[in-house]
């Protein structure tokens, strides 16, 4: 069991639901207390009155894939990791390769699709489906999440953060209510 933290501005949940994860996430993200504080600061910019929570969670990860900090980047980095793992797979790679090629083609065409420009909710639905399919491909390869050195939110004191693929891997064991202003001051310290 790994103890990690999650910063959120949502007050309406006490357990995680992968189906409701923010649209551009392949899984649910957890890290150090500093990373959770940094995430809250990112969500709220200069809004010092925002109520936020830092959740203390226990994660159950059996076989996470170690990756670079790819989560502040485009899908291209996730596809590169997937392609590398398909190449290493001990199972026949052809079914994974076909699915990978299909997902990559759909993703590459998404930005040029005029339907998405006219209907952002359609684009969000597309991305949610893409994330779901990417998550399932990594699960079929035997992984239940990612572990990565969080350079974006932990800064110079970069530490491991985690991305889990199934909400049943997460138990919320505590929470701390914070005002963004207090969180920001602690984060800068």
Regions found by a protein language model. Give the residues of each.
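Active-site and NAD+-binding cores of ADP-ribose-processing enzymes
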Residues: 1-189
């Amino acid at each position: 069991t790994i103890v990690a933290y999650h910063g959120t501005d949502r007050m309406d949940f006490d357990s995680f639901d992968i189906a409701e994860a923010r649209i551009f996430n392949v899984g649910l993200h957890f890290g150090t207390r500093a990373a959770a504080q940094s995430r809250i600061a990112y969500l709220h910019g200069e809004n010092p009155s925002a109520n936020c929570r830092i959740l203390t969670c226990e994660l159950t990860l059996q076989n996470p894939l170690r990756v670079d900090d790819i989560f502040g980047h485009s899908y291209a980095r996730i596809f590169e990791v997937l392609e590398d793992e398909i190449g290493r797979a001990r199972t026949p790679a052809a079914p994974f390769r076909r699915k990978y090629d299909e997902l990559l083609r759909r993703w590459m065409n998404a930005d040029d699709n005029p339907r998405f420009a006219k209907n952002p909710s359609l684009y969000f639905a597309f991305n949610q489906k893409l994330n779901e399919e990417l998550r399932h491909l990594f699960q079929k390869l035997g992984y239940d999440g990612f572990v990565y050195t969080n350079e974006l939110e932990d800064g110079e004191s970069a530490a491991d953060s985690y991305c889990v693929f199934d909400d049943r891997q997460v138990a919320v064991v505590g929470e701390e209510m914070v005002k963004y202003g207090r969180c920001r001051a602690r984060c800068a310290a």
